[in-house]
């Protein structure tokens, strides 16, 4: 039995590796979900989310949560990743396609994705078919989503379950921060440091371009640069970016050889939510009730006093 379980575990891991490998090559290994391979914590000490290491362009995102929530209740965290739905991005094969989106949500300790049986039907419809994966076994309050189609999920709804301090003594009724990162489109750099085909390519040496040849069936080009000392440098350019140089051009070090095809980008933000004590709300309501009653009594007392004064004047 143990042998069978070990074999099943190995098979599961193997399938997971194959799936991840597919996304790495076919889509982009710069989505938030792939940061898991290189970073134990997606949020660095300076507050920067590591997805920005691969998504070099900066784009805005938004997050909306209630100002305050009660313990052991389900609420929505809405992450908005806006972009022009008409634009196309360069895919790994050099062709144009729709943009995907991804997000990472960093919750405070005690907060979690609500179990399906706690999510209201109306909220389930907003969530759609999104799958929220924990960042790691150690980081159970960090969740990643994506890549998913941007046209359908540029606005993501996370169903969050708030903790109950009565059940978890380490939780208090306080204001808690929530951090989020979101990207649209593919990254420019892979986690190993190599460039994707969704970025600009520059010359590694100064000199004259002596040849531009197609790289093969998959597309792309091979440029030959002849330096001042007669050395020939080959520059391999993947399919996707468009050439901006011609044979005979003189280029300098780090001069652009292609356009920058990137139309996406990454952004991050933060917000706060108050875990509200129900007793405080009840106490506040009682206080308002006493204030209201006091106001009523004052009005009645004032009218009574005015009647007495009027009676004395008539007398």
Swiss-Prot record:
| Gene Ontology terms describing biological process | photosynthesis
Q: Which gene encodes it?
A: petA
Location of the protein in the cell: Plastid, Chloroplast thylakoid membrane
Q: Which GO terms describe its molecular function?
A: electron transfer activity; heme binding; iron ion binding
GO CC annotations, alphabetized: chloroplast thylakoid membrane
Protein's UniProt name? Cytochrome f
Q: Which organism is it from?
A: Chlorella vulgaris (Green alga)
The protein's role, per its UniProt record: Component of the cytochrome b6-f complex, which mediates electron transfer between photosystem II (PSII) and photosystem I (PSI), cyclic electron flow around PSI, and state transitions.
Cofactor binding mode, per the note?
A: Binds 1 heme group covalently.
Which SUPFAM superfamilies does this chain map to?
Answer: Cytochrome f subunit of the cytochrome b6f complex, transmembrane anchor, Cytochrome f, large domain, Rudiment single hybrid motif
């Amino acid at each position: 039995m143990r042998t069978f379980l070990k074999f099943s575990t190995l098979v599961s891991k193997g399938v997971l590796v194959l799936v991840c490998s597919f996304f790495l090559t076919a889509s982009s290994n710069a989505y938030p979900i792939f940061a898991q391979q290189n970073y134990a914590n997606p949020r660095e000490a300076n507050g920067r989310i590591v997805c920005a290491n691969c998504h070099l362009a900066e784009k805005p995102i938004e997050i909306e949560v209630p100002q305050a929530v009660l313990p052991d209740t389900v609420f929505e965290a809405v992450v908005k990743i806006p972009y022009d739905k008409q634009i196309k991005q360069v895919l790994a094969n050099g062709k144009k396609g729709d943009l995907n989106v991804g997000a990472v949500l960093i919750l405070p300790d005690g907060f979690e994705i609500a179990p399906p049986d706690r999510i209201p039907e109306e909220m389930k419809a907003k969530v759609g078919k999104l799958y929220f994966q924990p960042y790691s076994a150690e980081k159970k309050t960090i969740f990643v989503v994506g890549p998913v189609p941007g046209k359908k999920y540029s606005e993501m709804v996370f169903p969050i379950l708030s903790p109950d301090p009565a059940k978890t003594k380490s939780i208090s009724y306080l204001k808690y921060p929530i951090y989020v990162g979101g990207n649209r489109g593919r990254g420019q750099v892979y986690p190993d440091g190599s460039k994707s085909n969704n970025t600009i390519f520059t010359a590694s040496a100064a000199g004259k371009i002596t040849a531009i040849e197609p790289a093969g069936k998959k597309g792309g080009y091979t440029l030959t640069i002849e330096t001042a000392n007669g050395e020939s440098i080959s520059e391999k350019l993947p399919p996707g970016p468009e050439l901006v140089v011609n044979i005979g051009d003189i280029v300098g070090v780090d001069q652009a050889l292609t356009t920058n095809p990137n139309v996406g980008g990454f952004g991050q933000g933060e917000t706060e939510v108050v875990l509200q004590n129900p007793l405080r709300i009840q106490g506040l309501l009682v206080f308002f009730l006493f204030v209201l009653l006091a106001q009523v009594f004052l009005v009645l007392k004032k009218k009574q006093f005015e009647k007495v004064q009027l009676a004395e004047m008539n007398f």
